[in-house]
Amino acid sequence: TGLRIGPATAKGLALALDKPIVSVPTVDALAYNLWGCEDQVCPLMDARRQQAYTGLYTFSDGQMQTLLPQCAVGIDEITAKINESGKKTVFLGDGVPVFADYLKENLQVPYLFAPAHCNKQRAACVAVLGGILYRQGKAEDAAAHKPDYLRLSQAERERQEKARDFRI
């Protein structure tokens, strides 16, 4: 719900002030907490039901490179991708304590868990990444802005389920 309120507030302010919006992906911003890290970075946000909001990133030449764009996947799927990459990986986010035991048992690559102070979103990282995206021309008209939700809300899922049951 909070992630839905934020974009609605930003859109309202941008419309009132006639300003563009720069959409900063949540998982990208979390990865940016580890800017300059030499290892592969994997943010993990607990999406419940053994799923994580996640992605894969590296930093080179002073820039963040997206290897796997933010997505909602099972912890088994992201673990398999990391094992396939063969790269040492640093994990961060509120999903680390949730999935730590699974990762310890199933990772076949060297890994680290980032210190606790890196596991929360930082306004400074969102702002810096937003500035980079703005300079890359990724601002959009506030009226046209639609948030990029990685999965349907619970209310939307329940509505679809009821509609599906009604059709049967």
For each of these PLM feature ranges, what is it?
Residues 1-20:
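DPxDG-like acidic metal-binding loop motif
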Residues 139-143:
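Flexible, glycine/charged-enriched surface loops at secondary-structure junctions
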